[in-house]
Amino acid sequence: AADPAGLYGTVAKLTIRNASPGRCELRPFQISPEGPAASGVFGEQWCWFSHYFPRDWVIDHPRGADGDASYLVPHARELVLQFHESPDVGDAAHYPSLQMYVYGERMCMALTYDTTATSPNTSAGRVPNLQVLSSWPLVRGRWIDWVVRLKVSYAADGILEVYRDGRLEFAETGVPTFYNDILGGYFRGGLYRYGDAQMPASRTIYHRGFVLGDANSSYEEVAGKPALSRAAIRSIV
């Protein structure tokens, strides 16, 4: 489709209609994890992506236990990025360890992990160590560029950094970021819809794709330009 902002020529137009759950997914080339070491490190990954929410995007005000983390993620309206997993044989299905999603007028980021070998049945609503880490205003009518740096680990040595339009707006180190599984995870993104019959009949966003990197990569390599200086970092509203 033509870029609605008139900046980038042809871009991907992602639409989902009258379904919950619904999916319009971009599957970036999967970087193989470095393999689980004794400490549980699965390797470091970088992910750049850019999306555009149209000006006529209808804000869907959530109904339910607003602010309750256990409610937020399962009832998120639209997911735009996830770091997915491959559960061990005999293990229960997991929520993605990292999710970015629309919730009302906010773009939220949540993390879940499990250091134990057997995770609970998350389909029953038991999400281990779920944290809604941060949120930003949902911007419509403008391209937003994101970069996520993730060191995948179920030990206390993981890394999570999130850049928004070149600014480092969230950083946490020395924390678990994944499940205690044999296989590592992978990025998926696009538009995923969860909710109820009261939601809008269709949803559309525009997307410029993904650039992925491994432990040898950097912000500049995946984003194509340097990050802004730390002095330019804004506080998150």
Question: Model segments located where?
Answer:
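Low-complexity, Ser/Thr/Pro/Gly-rich disordered linker/stalk regions
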Residues: 1-236
